[in-house]
Structures are given as structure tokens and as C-alpha cells.
């Protein structure tokens, strides 16, 4: 079974296709017929040691102080402070609609996210993995997305949609890590 997580990179972002979600897959009683079972494998080294570092955990949540509508398919969210973290998106939209959540610390003169101060050394080979930009494909139902494999530095989030969509300050929350 394909995962809804279709790409992840700790340095850039996560791409998520909500159309591939399987309700209850992580709960007891889920019918996993056709799934492969976990298999025991050899250790990659003789001694396995845990990482000696503090865990990355949620420490605070922030609601947007402003959700500025740029046009029918683009919004810019302003959060009260610059954080290291992720955003939690809760939205319902047309099935197959692609949202891009571009996280940054600055705005340009037009009020759009400017990443000139943080993507200085980023050299992509194509447009498939934009820097600090989560990509979410909507299922047509009520969708919830929060990245599990990365975090970003940001105070502003530019949400652009492949089709017109209605968003408000309640659709996106900043989660500090």
C-alpha cells in the first residue's frame, strides 16, 4: 500500500497526498490483508546506541495574527513570532487540489514570503522539492496535515492552491518545536 507521505526531507519539507490515507491503519483491529509483515534483519553495526540529544518535541502553539488573502488561491499567514517548528493544516477542499505551504522568516515588498535569508545555499535541480515548502494534495474530505519528518524556521507562511479555496486564520496553526 502506498503511503500518503510521498516525499520527505529534513532540509526541505514533506509532500503529502491525503487521497492515499487509510483511516484507522494505525489502530487495533485494522484489516491489513495484503500488507507485508515486518521482518527481522541483522544489525547495521555490532553495537546499537541511541542518539545522545534532547528529543524534538512540541513546546507551543500559535494562532495566526493575520491571514491575508492575496487572491482566490493564495493567502499569507502571519504568526506572532519567528519559531523553529511546523504548521498544522486543517482544511476541506476539492479532491486533488494541491496546496503549497511556503514557510519563511521575511516578507517581500508585496507581502509574499521571501526566503532570501534562509535558502542561500539551497541548490535544487528542479521544482519537485521547493525549499521549506510542504505540498499537500487534498482528499475532498476534511484533511489534517502536520509534517512528521522535518521542521522549519518561519514566522510567515504563504499558502498557494492549484484551485480557488477559502481559508481563514483557523485553518493553519504554527507549532513550535
Q: Could you tell me what each predicted segment is?
A:
Residues 1-177:
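Extracellular/oxidizing-compartment recognition motifs
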Amino acid at each position: 500500500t502506498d503511503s500518503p507521505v510521498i516525499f520527505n526531507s529534513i532540509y526541505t519539507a514533506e509532500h503529502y497526498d491525503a487521497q492515499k490515507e487509510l483511516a484507522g491503519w494505525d489502530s487495533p483491529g485494522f484489516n491489513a490483508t495484503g500488507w507485508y509483515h515486518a521482518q527481522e534483519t541483522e544489525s547495521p553495526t555490532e553495537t546499537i546506541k541511541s542518539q545522545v540529544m534532547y528529543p524534538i518535541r512540541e513546546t507551543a502553539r500559535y494562532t495566526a495574527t493575520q491571514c491575508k488573502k492575496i487572491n482566490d488561491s493564495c493567502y499569507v499567514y502571519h504568526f506572532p513570532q519567528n519559531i523553529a517548528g511546523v504548521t498544522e493544516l486543517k482544511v476541506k477542499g476539492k479532491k486533488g487540489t494541491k496546496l503549497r505551504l511556503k514557510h519563511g522568516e521575511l516578507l517581500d515588498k508585496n507581502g509574499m514570503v521571501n526566503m532570501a535569508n534562509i535558502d542561500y545555499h539551497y541548490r535544487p535541480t528542479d521544482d519537485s522539492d521547493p525549499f521549506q515548502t510542504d505540498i499537500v494534495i487534498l482528499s475532498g474530505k476534511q484533511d489534517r496535515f502536520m509534517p512528521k519528518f522535518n521542521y522549519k524556521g518561519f514566522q510567515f507562511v504563504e499558502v498557494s492552491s492549484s484551485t480557488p479555496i477559502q481559508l481563514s486564520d483557523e485553518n493553519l496553526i504554527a507549532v513550535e518545536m
